[in-house]
């Protein structure tokens, strides 16, 4: 049996290491979404992590501050290690 431990430092993590990790997010409308993350890079250097197969942005990456933040409409989230 494996135990998932939340990735506590997701706000400062390189977005590339979050690819494929399990994420559980709660939206402002109290909808819970559970799935794996995929990375979308933009030409300006910014990046977005979203659920695979779903177009919802979950995490926004700011290359100027090297930090991650929850996208608009996301109230809380947890990111877990790869299994």
Task: Give the positions of each predicted feature.
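Basic/aromatic-rich interaction segments and small domains that mediate binding to polyanionic partners
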Residues: 31-62
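Short, exposed beta-strand/loop patches in secreted or surface proteins that constitute
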Residues: 15-16, 37-41, 68
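Intrinsically disordered, low-complexity, charged/polar segments
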Residues: 2-3, 55-83
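Short coil-to-beta-strand transition motifs
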Residues: 26-34, 72
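Mixed-charge, Lys/Arg-rich low-complexity intrinsically disordered regions
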Residues: 1-17
């Amino acid at each position: 049996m494996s135990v998932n431990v939340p990735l506590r430092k997701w706000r400062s993590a390189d977005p590339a290491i979050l690819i494929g990790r399990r994420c559980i997010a709660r939206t402002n409308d109290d909808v819970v979404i559970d799935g794996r993350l995929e990375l979308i890079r933009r030409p300006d250097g910014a990046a977005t992590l979203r659920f695979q197969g779903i177009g919802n942005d979950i995490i926004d990456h700011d290359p100027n501050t090297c930090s991650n933040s929850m996208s608009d409409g996301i109230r809380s989230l947890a990111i877990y290690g790869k299994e």
